[in-house]
Design a protein with these regions (language model features):
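Non-transmembrane "mature" sequence context
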Residues: 1-163
Length: 163
């Protein structure tokens, strides 16, 4: 299984469910609800989608880049984030550099701040919701083009979350 095939399978099983909710919208409010999961899956579609942890581990193992334990270690170490839904843990694919088969350093940097106060579900939502500090743009869309702004937004949101 290659990552390209995997990304396609995620997209194929994710029918379009409309626009991403605006900040404060309640589609993401219930982390365990089916509707919230569907909204989150749709929100990540343009950035590679989301995938189950076991699928990512199998892909990494096939490429000689790790296994389920190494994936779990990266999550526990705060290098990646995941969220749970329906007794499965899911990872947004934007966290990976698919050409180098590594975790994107920009993700590690943001997680070093937000991972202190946000759980996996909150992190997943934070990256795809329009952010006021970013003039209504989504952090996930700005990681490559305005990374310093994303870091500042993460630090501001961390401050607000922990005051």
């Amino acid at each position: 299984m290659t990552m390209t095939m995997h990304s396609a399978s995620v997209a194929e099983c994710s029918p379009r469910f409309g626009q991403i909710p605006a900040a404060g919208h309640d589609s993401f409010a219930q982390p365990l609800s089916d509707g919230a999961f569907v909204a989150l899956r749709a929100a990540y579609r343009s950035t590679g989608g989301i995938a189950r942890g076991d699928e990512i581990a199998a892909w990494a193992n096939q490429k000689g880049q790790g296994d389920f334990l190494s994936l779990n270690r990266a999550i526990v170490a705060g290098e990646l984030f995941s969220f749970s839904w329906n007794n499965t843990f899911w990872l947004p694919m934007f966290q990976f550099d698919l050409h180098k088969l590594t975790v994107r350093p920009e993700v590690r940097w943001v997680l070093a701040d937000l991972g202190k106060a946000f759980d996996g579900w909150e992190l997943a939502v934070w990256f795809v919701e329009p952010n006021a500090w970013l003039q209504g743009r989504r952090p996930v869309d700005l990681l490559e083009i305005s990374f310093p702004e994303v870091v500042l937004a993460a630090q501001a949101d961390l401050y607000i979350a922990t005051c």
